[in-house]
């Protein structure tokens, strides 16, 4: 049915031929062609009530949305605009962008923070105040977070956000309102998020049905046929976050480096105690204590079970103060720092105090040592992602920075009042090379919505639970024109994953999470392909054989058809002759996967999903006695 969708896209474009390509307020910006295209389609089809902007980080989905909001009154006079946004993103980019390019809509905007514990009450209170003659346009920024907060918990409890989700799914189309969902990573943790998002955009279209069988989509064609026009898809980098990507005129080159570091004996000792403590307390599935132990360890492991919280907190504070005091008036000499900046370690002829300090710091954290050395050797500015703020996280890392003489800013929950200004200073043209501020260390608070410019190295100290979060983190630094001020030879970003290892070769929590991420991505890749093939851009580019229409009366019927996956008509079992192979998507063998090569040259993954054809002259490397194909 994509031909039918193509006819409506064509109709919308014909209706909006005179829509300006520039947006003017106190400043002027000219939209990119892809931004102007999606705005024209969404505004040109008044009955297109909802749309997902699946745009990768840094391509301007906020700007696209503000342009749409600015032109809402081209199709109807009275609008109330409700923006559901994370608190950290309300001021920048949303309010700043609106004030700069569309100040006239400010009076119509209502910002509500969906992180607020009173979000539900605030939302419905605001809904009641809206004039009955006004149409509503709802914007859900980083909609994957909103969806995640709307999922029913494992214990069956319904979260407060769910009532807002239910209201929107029932009301938007019924009352002739509009809604735009924005995300660079619309699926983060589970396939259920895809179902939730589809039913928010197209209510009732995807009932309780199993989407996968043996990790393969049951009927991809049915999904694509019924979900046409669901989204706008602007993803220039479809590679895995662990793959290298060549640069372009607008985007910096990305190189991935896996930095494996062996934990010190002290760290290994604490790591094993942390593992045992997780088992005793029943929280081993979260791996929190082990993740913290791979990052930094005090001289002892503070047990938390069966203890007064105040007593436990006091012990942590004492350990922290003892470590902080041990570094008082201590720092590396200029000669040591000069050595580190060359990418070298201290030699036997180094100053004794430098060697002693380095040894002490390394015993407690090989990761922090590795990051500090990497920052000093970097030719430009750096980002460091550390999800933990207190105890063994950012609070400790900043002590390391002080000893190594690394200038920095912090973007975390501790710096809510100063972090926006600090990032602005970090991004200033005068700091392009990191002369004033070398590094920004950020927690999950800085994983979405903010932009960094002229970054050359990102250090990721702790694996997240999913590839989507890693994409968001890396996407803070690789954005459209983010390196325009950087010298041509430095228009690159090295992404360093710091992975801790045990001396006995057993997998650490870092390696466990790496495997979890890879397993999740197998299903997500197939769902992302559905988004791509149902997008306005794909349909417009690939469906040319349609009959033009002169009204949009049939659009609602077209997009309201229920999806039926019961027939499972595309699942067929075939016995293919061939051989088992090993393959990797990286020249540095970041991840090595099992696969299968058929006699016809087609290559499949371990679950039987077709990947691509074997090249005529494949690149092969030998690793641990295995032949590894590089694709």
UniProtKB/Swiss-Prot annotation:
- Pfam families membership: Helicase_C, NPHI_C, SNF2-rel_dom
Q: Where is the Helicase ATP-binding domain?
A: 42-204
- Subcellular localization, as worded in the UniProt entry: Virion
- Looking at the record's lineage, which domain of life comes first? Viruses
Q: What's a BP term from Gene Ontology annotated to this protein?
A: DNA-templated transcription
The UniProt keywords, alphabetically, are: ATP-binding, DNA-binding, Hydrolase, Late protein, Nucleotide-binding, Transcription, Virion
Q: Which InterPro entries match?
A: Helicase_ATP-bd, Helicase_C-like, NPHI_C, P-loop_NTPase, SNF2_N
Q: What is its EC number?
A: 3.6.1.15
> Mind telling me which PROSITE patterns this protein's record contains?
HELICASE_ATP_BIND_1, HELICASE_CTER
Question: Could you say which enzyme class this protein belongs to?
Answer: hydrolase
Record GO terms (molecular function): ATP binding; DNA binding; ribonucleoside triphosphate phosphatase activity
Q: Where on this chain does ATP bind?
A: 55-62
Looking at the record, the residues that make up the Helicase C-terminal domain are: 367-532
Q: Does the keyword NADP apply?
A: no
- Give the residue interval(s) assigned to the motif DEAH box: 141-144
Keyword ATP-binding found: yes
Quote a single Gene Ontology cellular component term: virion component
Reactions the enzyme catalyzes: a ribonucleoside 5'-triphosphate + H2O = a ribonucleoside 5'-diphosphate + phosphate + H(+)
Alphabetical list of SUPFAM superfamilies matching this protein: P-loop containing nucleoside triphosphate hydrolases
Q: Say what the protein does.
A: Acts with RNA polymerase to initiate transcription from late gene promoters.
User: What does the subunit comment say?
Assistant: Interacts with the late transcription elongation factor VLTF-4/OPG110. Interacts with the late transcription factors VLTF-1.
Return the similarity comment. Answer: Belongs to the helicase family. NPH I subfamily.
Task: From the Swiss-Prot or TrEMBL record, give the protein name.
Answer: Nucleoside triphosphatase I
Q: Please tell me the species this chain comes from.
A: Monkeypox virus
């Amino acid at each position: 049915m994509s031909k039918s969708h193509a006819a409506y896209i064509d109709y919308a474009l014909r209706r909006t031929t005179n829509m300006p390509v520039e947006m003017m307020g106190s400043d002027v910006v000219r939209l990119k062609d892809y931004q102007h295209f999606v705005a024209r389609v969404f505004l040109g089809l008044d009955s297109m009530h909802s749309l997902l902007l699946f745009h990768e980080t840094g391509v301007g989905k906020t700007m696209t949305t503000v342009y749409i909001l600015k032109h809402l009154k081209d199709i109807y006079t009275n609008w109330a605009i409700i923006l559901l946004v994370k608190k950290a993103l309300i001021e920048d980019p949303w309010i700043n962008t609106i004030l700069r390019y569309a100040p006239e809509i400010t009076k119509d905007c209502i910002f509500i923070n969906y992180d607020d514990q009173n979000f539900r009450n605030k939302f419905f209170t605001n809904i009641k105040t809206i004039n009955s003659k006004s149409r509503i346009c709802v914007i859900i920024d980083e909609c994957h977070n909103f969806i995640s907060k709307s999922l029913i918990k494992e214990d069956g409890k319904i979260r407060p956000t769910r009532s807002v989700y239910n209201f929107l799914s029932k009301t938007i189309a019924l009352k002739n309102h509009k809604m735009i969902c924005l995300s660079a990573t619309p699926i983060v943790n589970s396939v259920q998020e895809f179902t939730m998002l589809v039913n928010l955009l197209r209510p009732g279209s995807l009932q309780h049905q199993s989407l996968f069988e043996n990790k393969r989509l049951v009927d991809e064609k049915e999904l694509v046929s019924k979900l046409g026009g669901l989204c706008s898809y602007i993803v220039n980098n479809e590679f895995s976050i662990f793959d290298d990507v060549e640069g372009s005129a607008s985007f910096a080159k990305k190189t991935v480096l896996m930095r494996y570091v062996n934990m010190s004996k002290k760290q290994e000792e604490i790591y094993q105690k942390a593992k045992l403590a997780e088992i005793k307390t029943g929280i081993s599935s979260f791996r929190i204590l082990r993740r913290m132990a791979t990052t930094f360890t005090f001289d002892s492991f503070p047990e938390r079970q069966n203890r007064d919280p105040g007593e436990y907190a006091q012990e942590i504070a004492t350990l922290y103060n003892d470590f902080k005091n041990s570094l008082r008036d201590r720092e590396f000499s200029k000669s040591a720092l000069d050595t580190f900046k060359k990418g070298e370690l201290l030699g036997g002829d180094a100053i004794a105090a430098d060697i002693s300090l380095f040894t002490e710091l390394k015993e407690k954290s090989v990761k922090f040592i590795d990051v500090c050395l990497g920052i000093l050797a970097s030719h430009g500015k750096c980002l460091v992602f550390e999800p933990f703020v207190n105890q063994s996280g950012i609070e400790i890392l900043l002590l390391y920075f002080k000893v190594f003489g690394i200038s920095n800013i912090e973007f975390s929950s501790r710096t809510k009042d100063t972090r926006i200004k600090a990032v602005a200073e970090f991004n200033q043209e005068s700091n392009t090379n990191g002369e004033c501020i070398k590094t920004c260390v950020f927690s999950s608070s800085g994983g979405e919505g903010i932009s960094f410019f002229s970054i050359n190295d990102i250090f990721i100290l702790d694996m997240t639970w999913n590839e989507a979060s890693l994409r968001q983190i890396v996407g803070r630094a690789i954005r459209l024109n983010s390196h325009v001020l950087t010298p041509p030879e430095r228009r690159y970003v090295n992404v360093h994953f710091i992975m801790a290892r045990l001396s006995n070769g057993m997998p650490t929590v870092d390696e466990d999470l790496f495997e979890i991420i890879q397993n999740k991505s197998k299903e997500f890749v197939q769902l992302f392909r559905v988004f791509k093939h149902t997008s306005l851009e794909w349909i417009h580019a690939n469906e040319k054989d349609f009959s033009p229409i002169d009204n949009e009366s049939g659009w609602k019927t077209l997009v309201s058809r229920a999806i039926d996956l019961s027939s499972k008509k595309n699942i067929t079992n075939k016995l293919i002759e061939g051989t088992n192979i090993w393959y990797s998507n990286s020249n540095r063998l970041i991840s090595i996967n099992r696969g299968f090569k058929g006699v016809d040259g087609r290559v499949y993954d371990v679950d039987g999903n077709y990947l691509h054809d074997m090249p005529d002259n494949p690149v092969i490397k030998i690793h641990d006695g295995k032949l590894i194909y590089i694709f």
